[in-house]
Structure formats: C-alpha cells, structure tokens
Amino acid sequence: MVRTEGDSWDIVTSVGYTALAVAAGRALDAKLDPPLAHDDHAAAFVAAAGAPQLAAAVATADMTSSAAFNAQWVGVRTRFFDNFFADAAGAGVRQHVILAAGLDSRAYRLPWPAITTVFELDQPKVLQFKDEVLKRSGAQPSARRVTVAVDLRDDWPAALREAGFDATQPTGWILEGLLPYLPGAAQDALFERLNDMSAPGSRVAAELGPEPGELERLAASIKTVVGETSDGETQPNLRDLWFDDPRLDTKTWLGERGWTVTEANLVDAAVAYGRPLRDLPPAFENFLSTKFFTAVQDHPRG
C-alpha cells in the first residue's frame, strides 16, 4: 500500500503492521543469547493481531524465520532506547513522551521512579488495540501512563498539552522507528515543535530516516519489512512506507539551538551489549551505524 497524504492505519495495515513486526522481533529477542529487549507483552500483541505469519513465528520460536532476523537488531535498538530512558530518569527527568508509540510497553516494563508520567502518542486504532490487549492481560503500568490519540502530522503539541504535558518541566523524548515514515517537511516541523516544548534539561533520542537515494539501497537489501508474503497477510515494502526526500540536518539544527548532540552507532552498541549483529546487509548495517543519536538541551530554548 503506497502512502498518501493524511493516510491512517490500524495494527495490521501499512505503518501499523511494522509496529506489529517490531513486537514480533521483541518477542523472539527473548530466545537470543543474551536477550536485550525483555518485553513480556510483545508476544500477546502478536497473538491478538491476526497476522498469521508473525504469530506462527513467535508461537513456534522459529529462529529461521525472517521475523527472527528482525529480532537481533530490534533487540539492540530496544536496549538503546531503554538505556536512554534510564539515563534520563537518573538525571531527574520525570516526564517522558513516546512519539509514535506503536506497541511500545515501556510504561509497563521499565522500573520508573515514583511520580513519573509517560505520554504515548499514536494513531487512535493502534492505541485502542494496545489498550485492549494490555487490559485483557491484567497488566499494570509502572508509571502514570497517558495515551494521546493523534496523528503526528497534525497539531500533536496541542493534544499533548491538553493531556497534561507541562512544557516548563524537562522531558525525555524518544523517536524510535518514526522518522523514516515522515516526509521531510513533517520531520522538520516535528523537531521545531519538540524544541519549542523542551525545557532546559530535556533529552531526546532518535532514529533518523534515510538520505535521498538511500531508500533504494535499503529496500534492495530488505525486500519487505518481515519477509515474503503469505495467504491472508500482506506485508508492506519499505519503498511504499518510508520517505527519503530532502530534510534538515537534524543533528546540526539541534546543536544550533542549545542541544548537545551525541551520535550513536548501534552496530558498536550491539558489541557492548554482548550480542554482536550478524549477517546484516551492508546498506542496513550502515543505517544502524549512522542514523541514531541522543541530545540534551543545555540552554534555554530559542
């Protein structure tokens, strides 16, 4: 399904399906040595969604499946963003925002300090599905969890403020698996809004999208998000989902506005976590090596 302006999705179509594929990766990560994601809710999401190929891979712990290929890098990416939140909490940040939260369960599975609020923003149908699965399982969040049903191409800052977000307090922001799905102009606008809403001491961790022309190399290496199609299960192609149109140099842009930016290489991080990535297509290895960063707002906004 080719992306269109203002398009929407549920958990088994278009961009929503990729959140489900990531959940499958987190579920299978538990079978790797050592596991890095530690997500006890991921398998329940996959089982409830009605996506037979992913459900079968998770249920049988099929480590030869294409979903298992996802597991090795999804686990590393998950640990990277988990560590970011732990560092932010250790620095005293008590307000956190997960943009395009998908099936992220960090509000439940991370050991948050007392009086912590986690805001989750995503499409209404995605959040509804997640809430239903978590409710059936009896899961209880370890922080105050606030869901905000909004399209990030719309006025999400207004929706976030209405939900109780306090722009005078430091915030921990994560943009995990989001920016490749935004057109360049939408990404640039998102960071402008994020900067405007970030008090000194705020932090951000992000995964950037591909450069112009890079998408073709990635798509050639990884034909679909999770492998071949099967009956009744349509799996989207990266070319149909990601954007690689021109956009600002985000890291430089943030640096010019008082943020201290630190680049992150997830290939090196995997080694540090004790589980090196193996057999990655070169284009994908380059993506994991160059597209991640963290930043701290050290100075007043401007």
From Swiss-Prot:
Pfam families: LCM. GO terms for biological process: methylation. S-adenosyl-L-methionine binds at D122, D151, L152. SUPFAM superfamilies: S-adenosyl-L-methionine-dependent methyltransferases (SSF53335). GO terms for molecular function: methyltransferase activity. Keywords: Methyltransferase, S-adenosyl-L-methionine, Transferase. The keyword Cytoplasm does not apply. Transmembrane segments: none annotated. Its EC number is 2.1.1.-. Belongs to the UPF0677 family. Exhibits S-adenosyl-L-methionine-dependent methyltransferase activity. NCBIfam families: mthyl_TIGR00027 (TIGR00027). This is Putative S-adenosyl-L-methionine-dependent methyltransferase MAB_4586c.
